[in-house]
Amino acid sequence: MQLHRINTMDLKHSLRDLCMNPRHTSWAAPLLILGDAVLCALIIWRVPYTEIDWTTYMQQISLYISGERDYTLIKGSTGPLVYPAAHVYIYNILYHLTDEGRDIFLGQILFAILYLATLTVAMTCYRQAGAPPYLLVPLVLSKRLHSVFMLRLFNDGIAAFAMWVSIFLFMNKKLAAGVIVWSTGVAIKMTLLLLAPAIAMVLVLSLSFGPSIRLGFLAVLIQVLFGIPFLRNNPAGYVSRAFELTRQFMFKWTVNWRFVGEELFLSRKFSLALLALHLLLLGLFVATVWLEPSGSNLPSFLQRLIQRRYRTASLSKSFVMTAMLSSLAIGLLCARSLHYQFFAYLACATPFLLWQAGFHPILVYVVWAAQEWAWNAYPSTNASSLVVVLSLAAQVFGVLGNSFSRKHLDQSSQKEHMQ
């Protein structure tokens, strides 16, 4: 009886160590990726491809190949070209690789490789940030994420890959390379602009103000270089189409705000309220979570920065990853409208953010599962859209609240030490 009890305790200890000890991620990650590769093959083999934008992409590329450089005249069956120039160049390559877009099967294989590459980089970031192995499992179980990459062939998959590569580079202090890859991602789809506030903080904390400004100019220069063929022809048309910020979203496609009703969704007041919330949350994160490595409050930090007396901080990999993913989550929470393909950016970020929020592993899985259900509900419902917003709120306010809790504990321990 006692031996059985000891064996049970040993088993529990071993299972806990397997789930919680970060050293196990070095072998767990390759096994999960290998298993997911098999799953990808099964999906391509068994699940029918769904045509949404691929044909339109190919029609637009056909016009580009024929010599059209006026962005306002490049269109397809489902609408005009509304993505920056790097999207055109990448799908131009895919156009030629897939027999002008006709070889869908090859396209799916290429996107499966892209998916596995994205997953590999994301898991590498998790491992370097010291995340426990149990967080890796949800990364390979997302039905919607597999769909975005392999069954839809959306450009969001390519942009998500660029996002994770840039996060990896910033974590490893390859700041210039990180800026180049991130800006290239923005030139595929400007959703990656949501990471800009955190990237600015990482650069300023790591390099101070002057060098950060230079890297900011580098990011802008990359956008100009990508856009040159179109800027020469119709600069206003290119900028207005590729970086349109005033687009009117359709209520029937929204994943996140269906529960507020169409009248409120379409109102200018709602749009301004979301913008105000976005700015407020960014301000809170700058003043608390993202400023933590500087060891000072916001006024003194700004004063030292202006007076050029700021000493650069050494940023942990976990901090960099948290900053960039929380900036993404804030942007998605306050987004005017989310569509299903946006899950390409969020899917691999959620487990890490919930862990950084200090949630119990069971709660991490509950919130993750609820979010996965909500993003798989088609069409979206009042209930599913509410869960989308609440799960994002859990990530954003969880990270913010955990940061406040840590600061309070640190202050309390310092007082006890002084006494």
From Swiss-Prot:
<feature type="topological domain" description="Cytoplasmic">
    <location>
        <begin position="46"/>
        <end position="77"/>
    </location>
</feature>
<dbReference type="GO" id="GO:0006488">
    <property type="term" value="P:dolichol-linked oligosaccharide biosynthetic process"/>
</dbReference>
<dbReference type="GO" id="GO:0006486">
    <property type="term" value="P:protein glycosylation"/>
</dbReference>
<feature type="topological domain" description="Lumenal">
    <location>
        <begin position="405"/>
        <end position="419"/>
    </location>
</feature>
<keyword id="KW-0472">Membrane</keyword>
<feature type="transmembrane region" description="Helical">
    <location>
        <begin position="213"/>
        <end position="231"/>
    </location>
</feature>
<keyword id="KW-1133">Transmembrane helix</keyword>
<feature type="topological domain" description="Lumenal">
    <location>
        <begin position="99"/>
        <end position="103"/>
    </location>
</feature>
<feature type="topological domain" description="Lumenal">
    <location>
        <begin position="171"/>
        <end position="178"/>
    </location>
</feature>
<feature type="topological domain" description="Cytoplasmic">
    <location>
        <begin position="208"/>
        <end position="212"/>
    </location>
</feature>
<feature type="transmembrane region" description="Helical">
    <location>
        <begin position="270"/>
        <end position="290"/>
    </location>
</feature>
<feature type="transmembrane region" description="Helical">
    <location>
        <begin position="179"/>
        <end position="207"/>
    </location>
</feature>
<comment type="function">
    <text>Dol-P-Man:Man(5)GlcNAc(2)-PP-Dol alpha-1,3-mannosyltransferase that operates in the biosynthetic pathway of dolichol-linked oligosaccharides, the glycan precursors employed in protein asparagine (N)-glycosylation. The assembly of dolichol-linked oligosaccharides begins on the cytosolic side of the endoplasmic reticulum membrane and finishes in its lumen. The sequential addition of sugars to dolichol pyrophosphate produces dolichol-linked oligosaccharides containing fourteen sugars, including two GlcNAcs, nine mannoses and three glucoses.</text>
</comment>
<keyword id="KW-0328">Glycosyltransferase</keyword>
<feature type="transmembrane region" description="Helical">
    <location>
        <begin position="25"/>
        <end position="45"/>
    </location>
</feature>
<feature type="topological domain" description="Lumenal">
    <location>
        <begin position="232"/>
        <end position="269"/>
    </location>
</feature>
<feature type="topological domain" description="Lumenal">
    <location>
        <begin position="336"/>
        <end position="348"/>
    </location>
</feature>
<feature type="transmembrane region" description="Helical">
    <location>
        <begin position="78"/>
        <end position="98"/>
    </location>
</feature>
<feature type="topological domain" description="Cytoplasmic">
    <location>
        <begin position="291"/>
        <end position="314"/>
    </location>
</feature>
<feature type="topological domain" description="Cytoplasmic">
    <location>
        <begin position="125"/>
        <end position="147"/>
    </location>
</feature>
<feature type="transmembrane region" description="Helical">
    <location>
        <begin position="349"/>
        <end position="369"/>
    </location>
</feature>
<feature type="transmembrane region" description="Helical">
    <location>
        <begin position="384"/>
        <end position="404"/>
    </location>
</feature>
<dbReference type="Pfam" id="PF05208">
    <property type="entry name" value="ALG3"/>
</dbReference>
<dbReference type="GO" id="GO:0052925">
    <property type="term" value="F:dol-P-Man:Man(5)GlcNAc(2)-PP-Dol alpha-1,3-mannosyltransferase activity"/>
</dbReference>
<feature type="transmembrane region" description="Helical">
    <location>
        <begin position="148"/>
        <end position="170"/>
    </location>
</feature>
<dbReference type="GO" id="GO:0005789">
    <property type="term" value="C:endoplasmic reticulum membrane"/>
</dbReference>
<feature type="transmembrane region" description="Helical">
    <location>
        <begin position="104"/>
        <end position="124"/>
    </location>
</feature>
<keyword id="KW-0256">Endoplasmic reticulum</keyword>
<feature type="topological domain" description="Lumenal">
    <location>
        <begin position="1"/>
        <end position="24"/>
    </location>
</feature>
<keyword id="KW-0808">Transferase</keyword>
<feature type="transmembrane region" description="Helical">
    <location>
        <begin position="315"/>
        <end position="335"/>
    </location>
</feature>
<dbReference type="GO" id="GO:0005783">
    <property type="term" value="C:endoplasmic reticulum"/>
</dbReference>
<dbReference type="InterPro" id="IPR007873">
    <property type="entry name" value="Glycosyltransferase_ALG3"/>
</dbReference>
<protein>
    <recommendedName>
        <fullName>Dol-P-Man:Man(5)GlcNAc(2)-PP-Dol alpha-1,3-mannosyltransferase</fullName>
        <ecNumber>2.4.1.258</ecNumber>
    </recommendedName>
</protein>
<comment type="pathway">
    <text>Protein modification; protein glycosylation.</text>
</comment>
<keyword id="KW-0812">Transmembrane</keyword>
<feature type="topological domain" description="Cytoplasmic">
    <location>
        <begin position="370"/>
        <end position="383"/>
    </location>
</feature>
<comment type="similarity">
    <text>Belongs to the glycosyltransferase ALG3 family.</text>
</comment>
